[in-house]
Amino acid sequence: LAPVAFLDGDPAMPRTYVFIVGESANRNHLSLYGYKRNTTPKLEAMRDELVVFEDVISPDTHTIPSLRKVLLFSELQKGDTILTSPSVLTLLNSAGFTTYWISNQAVNVEGATGVRLFAEDAKQVSFLNMARDEGRSVSYDSVLLPELEKILGNSVERKAIFIHLMGSHLTYAL
C-alpha cells in the first residue's frame, strides 16, 4: 500500500486521533448529544476540541458485522470487503501513524477472534480484560484510562488510538 498523503496541511505536524468503539452505547443517553441528565460532563467540557458526529448510525446490531462495515469502508447494501479492502488502521499505518488498539472486551471468549482480526492491524494492541466469560466479566471501562494516558504521554507524534469499550455488555441481575 502506497503512503497516504495528508490533505490538510503539514504532514510533520503532531496529530493524535482517538476513535471510540462504543459497545451498546446509545447517544440518546449522552448529554453531549442533548440528553437532559449530565452523563458526559468531561466530554462536554472539551467539546471545542472534539469532532462530534451528529448523524451516524451503526450499520449492524452485532459487533463483528459492524466493525467490518465501518473499518473497511463497506457500503451498507453491498457485500463484505474483508478480503479486498485495507482497514482504516492499515491506511493510518501507511500514512505514518502509530496505531493502537486498547480493548476492554474479553479476549478469551467465543467471538473475540473477529475483533482480534481488526485489532491486529494496529501496531500496538492491548486487551485488558482477560475474562473467559464475558457475561460474568465486571470490567469497567475505566481500566482503559491508565493505558490511554500512557499512550497520550509517549513521544510518538502521530497516533491513532482505537478504544474498544465493554459498554453495556454486563449481565444484569435483580
Q: What residue ranges belong to the model's regions?
A:
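Active-site-proximal alpha/beta segments of enzymes that process anionic O-linked groups
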Residues: 1-19, 24-174
